């Protein structure tokens, strides 16, 4: 049963104290959100909020008096520990309304004035302590419009940086788009029914937030413009609806306008190489198949020196580009960094430009997020100090980029680093060299910045001389040699006299505190001075807070250039990290062409090669005359690694990175598909085979001649003949209809006949060799089909009992003998005469049985335990069995 009163007006509030009435009004405003209600040094929660918070945060649940005759549940957290509790709540998908005291307790006649100043939700985090340093945390909104031809509008905002994006797609693509963006929170209309998987928090808002006119008006008002034409979104009505609703929600959570959100970036179909959720997972771009952060492609490449660079690298890996021009610009910048390093020894000594640049980047904080917090007025003093120091280092970094002028992109980035000198000068004058953590602690504004503050500080802190003089005068006046003038936070200033000297105390001394061995007094002169000092401390802190607010006002005009500078620093950092990785590991610049083609010479898997001592390079050629590679070979032979390797090299090439190969040529791709591995979707009621077919259906429906498709052992989840038939039909469809660039791994050797019918298909295999010790995987891709699968040898290496291996070998021989005249390829070719087939099967079955019996007898003999006579007898028996 709910312990919270259901109404907050009229008679419902009459039975509550004024403070609780205030709380209930604010709680009604917060709605279902947890309300952190500031009371002194604690945030308190009451009623259901207290019970919920106590359960989620493991807090002690207490009571605070009675209201309407019922004890009020209460739980609280210290103000200084708020961030750690917020982080835990947000991780659990909770949202919290922060209510602060905004009135002066000393001047308040009733409850101190309070107001909800901020709402913290999973998608609206801006505090450094709550955000992952190397990943974005976006807030998204979705709106589906139209009945005859529905369109899904999607908007997403990174509140910690101000980046605001929109796009439109078919409703069926919405889940894939959300997986690409990976927002922490999704806003949708109350009546909207979105049947799709989404792991983040969902928030419903009134339908009218998504109405076209209101959403458009919200955007026009925010950007202070009469038209959205300048943002290139006029032809995206569903996206505009989503963007307006999102901006309204985000502004409400911050209780202010979002000054750092200064533009909308419209993303169009065809801008990126599309990767569906299955492909992102299978390629392990930023998360392993087991959910770990390492080893992944991102963890391998992330040598960035700033959090901004790491986040940009993550975005690049998830958003490979289709068009060659921007990719080539990045690639050229990386090549220039490497070339200057090799040839620019005179300018940069032995270290080289690349090392100099990367070392310089170490000095830069997360300017992207600091700029956002300046706009939101939540920036901390020490962040401003780090920004000040970064601006001091910026001119030297800018000058060091001069040798990169051969790269147009590097020149553009260098130009973006230029900052107005005023901001650096302002921060240098205003912020103390080592400011306090929070403005409430004082010591943030630098000495000399404000004369009034300097006077108050002097009055509050430089009273040492006065106290020394007062103590000397009082000792002389009273004749008390051990008299002391001291201070503590509880009783303020006092004169302490030992018990044995109290008879010498003058009449103007007033007792302040009695101790066991001493008395403490105050005099009119000391009281007057105490009032001045304590008043000066309060006024000093108030003045400093006011000056800090004025400083934030002055810094607001620099948010845009700060954001541009941060963007340039992030890209320079990312490019330098990719250049350093290419230099260390012998990666090369791929050739980018317009046609759909992949030609790799001696390619390597970027992650696997770093995990093993020796990696075998392999090439791959897919072009107009060679659309599909049918890949056969043993289990553990490296088929899946090879396929992923090709996809990762293609993806890296489309991000602008160098690639692990001796030579590579990669064309314009529109999508990358993968069908690798097997997994059940138990919650969705789909078996392994159903999942396999669902993924295959998506590939057949969407792949084009410009797509790269990876299909691994399709059809293995059902019976042999069903699986073979499906694998053949799917491969044939991909080859003749979709015409996608396809890597098709299979254990169905019957499929290796496909190139005989379709010349644009080719056979390759992962080589293996048998030795006395068993099978040896060569991990080398060779032309032509494999001769066998070596499944039993792999099982033997895995530790399957010898008896099972022997029985499996006999069964394999029997099956091969039976199936030799009528291989499964008979599904697609004419069968032999039935009588001839039957006779051959009978003869081979008899031979196989005799051979199996002989093998069993031989395996049962232990030569070491036989006498010479017994060994000779055994040999005769075996010989007789053969005849």
UniProtKB/Swiss-Prot annotation:
Record's keyword terms, sorted: ATP-binding, DNA damage, DNA repair, DNA-binding, Nucleotide-binding
Name of the protein: DNA mismatch repair protein MutS
Species this chain originates from: Bordetella parapertussis (strain 12822 / ATCC BAA-587 / NCTC 13253)
InterPro entries: DNA_mismatch_repair_MutS, DNA_mismatch_repair_MutS-lik_N, DNA_mismatch_repair_MutS/MSH, DNA_mismatch_repair_MutS_C, DNA_mismatch_repair_MutS_clamp, DNA_mismatch_repair_MutS_core, DNA_mismatch_repair_MutS_N, DNA_mismatch_repair_MutS_sf
GO cellular component, one term: cytosol
Claim: Nucleotide-binding is one of the keywords in the record: yes
Origin superkingdom: Bacteria
Family in the record: Belongs to the DNA mismatch repair MutS family.
């Amino acid at each position: 049963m709910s312990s919270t009163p259901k109404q907050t007006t009229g008679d419902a509030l009459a039975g509550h104290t004024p403070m609780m009435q205030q709380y209930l009004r604010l709680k009604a405003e917060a709605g279902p959100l947890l309300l952190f209600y500031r009371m002194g040094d604690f945030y308190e929660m009451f009623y259901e909020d207290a019970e919920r918070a106590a359960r989620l945060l493991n807090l002690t649940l207490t009571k605070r008096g009675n209201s309407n005759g019922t004890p009020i549940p209460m739980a609280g957290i210290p103000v200084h520990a708020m961030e750690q509790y917020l982080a835990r709540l947000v991780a659990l998908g909770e949202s919290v309304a922060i209510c602060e005291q905004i009135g002066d307790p000393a001047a308040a006649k009733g409850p101190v004035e309070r107001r909800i100043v901020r709402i913290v939700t999973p998608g609206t985090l801006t505090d450094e302590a709550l955000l992952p340093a190397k990943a974005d945390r976006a807030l998204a909104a979705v709106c589906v419009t139209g009945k005859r031809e529905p369109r899904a509008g999607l908007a997403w905002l990174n509140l910690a940086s101000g980046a605001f994006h929109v796009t439109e797609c078919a409703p069926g693509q919405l889940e894939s788009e959300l997986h690409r963006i990976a927002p922490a929170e999704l806003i949708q209309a109350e009546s909207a029914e979105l049947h799709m998987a989404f792991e983040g928090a969902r928030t419903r808002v009134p339908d009218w937030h998504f109405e076209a006119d209101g959403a458009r008006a919200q955007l026009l008002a925010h950007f202070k413009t009469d038209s959205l034409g300048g943002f290139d979104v006029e032809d995206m009505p569903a996206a505009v609806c989503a963007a307006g609703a999102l901006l309204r929600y985000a502004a409400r959570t911050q209780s202010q306008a979002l000054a750092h959100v200064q533009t909308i970036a419209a993303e169009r179909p065809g801008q990126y190489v599309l990767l569906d959720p299955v492909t992102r997972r299978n390629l392990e771009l930023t998360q392993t198949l087991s959910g770990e952060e390492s080893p992944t492609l991102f963890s391998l490449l992330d040598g960035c020196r700033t959090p901004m660079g790491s986040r940009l690298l993550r975005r690049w890996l998830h958003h490979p580009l289709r068009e060659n021009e921007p990719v080539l610009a990045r690639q050229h910048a990386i090549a220039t960094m490497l070339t200057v390093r090799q040839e620019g020894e005179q300018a940069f000594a032995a270290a080289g430009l690349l090392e100099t640049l990367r070392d310089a980047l170490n000095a830069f904080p997360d300017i992207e997020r600091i700029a956002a917090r300046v706009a939101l007025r939540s920036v901390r003093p020490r962040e401003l100090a780090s920004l000040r120091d970064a601006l001091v280092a910026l001119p030297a970094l800018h000058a060091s980029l001069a040798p990169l002028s051969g790269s147009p992109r590097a020149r553009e980035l260098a130009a973006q680093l230029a900052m107005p000198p005023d901001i650096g000068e302002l921060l240098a004058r205003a912020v103390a060299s080592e400011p306090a953590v929070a403005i409430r602690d004082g010591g943030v504004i630098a000495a000399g910045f404000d004369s009034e503050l300097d006077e108050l500080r002097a009055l509050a802190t430089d009273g040492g001389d006065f106290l020394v003089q007062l103590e000397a005068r009082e000792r002389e006046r009273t004749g008390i040699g051990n008299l002391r003038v001291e201070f503590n936070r509880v009783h303020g200033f006092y004169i302490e006299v030992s018990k044995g000297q109290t008879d010498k105390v003058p009449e103007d001394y007033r007792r302040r505190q009695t101790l066991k061995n001493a008395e403490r007094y105050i005099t009119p002169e000391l009281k007057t001075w105490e009032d001045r000092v304590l008043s000066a401390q309060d006024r000093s802190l108030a003045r400093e807070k006011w000056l800090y607010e004025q400083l934030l006002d002055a810094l607001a005009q620099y948010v845009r250039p700060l954001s541009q500078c941060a963007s340039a620093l992030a890209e320079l950092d990312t490019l330098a990290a990719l250049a350093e990785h290419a230099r260390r590991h012998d990666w090369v610049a791929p050739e980018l062409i317009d046609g759909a083609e992949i030609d790799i010479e001696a390619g390597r898997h970027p992650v696997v090669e770093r995990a093993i001592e020796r990696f075998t390079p392999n090439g791959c050629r897919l072009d107009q005359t060679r659309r599909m590679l049918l890949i056969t070979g043993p289990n553990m032979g490296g088929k899946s690694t090879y396929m992923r390797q090709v996809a990762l090299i293609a993806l890296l090439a489309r991000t602008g990175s160098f690639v692990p190969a001796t030579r590579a040529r990669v064309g314009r791709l529109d999508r990358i598909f993968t069908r690798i591995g097997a997994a059940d979707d138990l919650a969705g009621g789909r078996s392994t085979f159903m999942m396999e077919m669902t993924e295959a259906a998506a590939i057949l429906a969407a792949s084009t001649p410009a797509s790269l498709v990876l299909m691994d052992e399709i059809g293995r989840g059902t019976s042999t003949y069903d699986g073979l038939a499906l694998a053949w039909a799917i491969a044939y469809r991909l080859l003749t209809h979709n015409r996608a660039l396809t890597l098709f791994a299979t254990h169905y050797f019957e499929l290796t006949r496909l190139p005989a019918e379709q010349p644009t298909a080719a056979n390759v295999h992962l080589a293996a060799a048998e030795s006395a010790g068993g099978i040896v995987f060569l991990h080398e891709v060779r032309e032509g089909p494999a001769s066998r699968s070596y499944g039993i040898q792999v099982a033997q290496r895995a530790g399957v009992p010898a008896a099972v291996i022997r029985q499996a070998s006999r069964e394999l021989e029997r099956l091969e003998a039976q199936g030799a005249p009528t291989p499964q390829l008979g599904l697609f070719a004419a069968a032999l005469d039935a009588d001839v087939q039957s006779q051959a099967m009978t003869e081979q079955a008899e031979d196989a049985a005799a051979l199996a019996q002989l093998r069993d007898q031989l395996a049962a003999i232990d030569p070491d335990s036989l006498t010479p006579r017994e060994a000779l007898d055994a040999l005769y028996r075996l010989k007789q069995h053969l005849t």
